[in-house]
């Protein structure tokens, strides 16, 4: 009986240690992912956009990208960039 209780307590202790390790690893991974997202966000903010992307609002002074065309779409009350059925060349 004492052996069974000791085994159960030991198993619970092992599970607690493993759980703590996984939680610490998950937290480190989460922090690393957050840093990566912030780096990508900062890099994209520095790029100047010359054209409007898909479903973006467009006017004469805000043109759509090459593979998009500016169209009036009902019930939206302004022009938006929609696909012109072509693909951008890379």
Curated annotation (Swiss-Prot):
Where on the tree of life does the source sit, at the highest rank? Answer: Eukaryota
UniProt-recorded Gene Ontology molecular function terms: ion channel inhibitor activity; toxin activity
UniProt feature coiled coil, ranges: none
According to its UniProt record, where is this protein located? Secreted
- Disulfide connectivity for this sequence is 51-65, 58-70, 64-81
Q: Where is the signal peptide?
A: 1-19
Chain positions listed as propeptide in the UniProt record: 20-50
Q: May I have one GO cellular component term?
A: extracellular region
Q: In which tissues is it expressed?
A: Expressed by the venom gland.
Q: Which UniProt keywords apply?
A: Disulfide bond, Ion channel impairing toxin, Knottin, Secreted, Signal, Toxin
Output the InterPro entries linked to this UniProt entry: Huwentoxin-1 (IPR011696)
The similarity comment for this entry is: Belongs to the neurotoxin 10 (Hwtx-1) family. 13 (Hntx-13) subfamily.
Relay the domain remarks. Answer: The presence of a 'disulfide through disulfide knot' structurally defines this protein as a knottin.
- Please explain the role this protein plays, according to its UniProt record: Ion channel inhibitor.
> What is the name attached to this protein's record?
U7-theraphotoxin-Hhn1a 1
């Amino acid at each position: 009986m004492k052996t069974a209780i000791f085994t159960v307590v030991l198993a619970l202790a092992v599970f607690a240690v493993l759980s703590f390790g996984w939680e610490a690893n998950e937290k480190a991974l989460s922090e690393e992912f957050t840093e990566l997202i912030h780096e990508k966000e900062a890099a994209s903010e520095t790029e100047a956009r010359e054209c409007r992307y898909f479903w973006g609002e467009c006017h004469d002074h805000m043109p759509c990208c090459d593979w998009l065309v500016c169209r009036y779409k009902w019930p939206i009350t302004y022009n938006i960039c929609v696909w012109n059925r072509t693909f951008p060349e890379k």
